[in-house]
Amino acid sequence: FAEATSKEICERAGTNGAAVNYYFGGKEGLYEEVLIEAHRQMLSLEDLNRIITSEATPEEKLRVFLEHIIRTAMNASELWGIRIFLRELASPSPFVPKFITTAVFPKSQKLRELIRDITGLPPDSPAMQRATALVALPCMGLILFPEKLRTLMLPATAGDAEGLLEDML
């Protein structure tokens, strides 16, 4: 991608040579959208909103959130966005700050609301940030750590979605 021109990207996609510029303002805009879609594959804002705004108790909402993450982790090998995300973790591009503002921050805010409802922690406290990290980071690890390696190194995590869920709760 880094060395490709917008025209080459369009040719490979079988679209008009000007499509990337027209729809995304250039290949940089396209890549920003790719990052947003990669994150959406793991957890869409719509799915998170549905969980957070449900009539369930905060603890039940956390369970549903974790179930969603575990299901995604069990199918992560089918998601092309995971490979993009892993590349960004290994070597962050200049597009990461906008991606965090656009895709990650709104979801993080929703997750903090849920954690606040469970813990009663002040929204901007260091303890809230740590609590959010302690929920979010294991979720990211499950999704991003390749299943073949996870199964090889930690065989008890393979195929035991219910066991993972109970342990995370």
Language-model regions: role of each:
Residues D160-M168:
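Individual transmembrane alpha-helices with interfacial aromatic-anchor signatures
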Residues A76-T101, P146-L152:
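Amphipathic alpha-helical segments used for helix-helix packing
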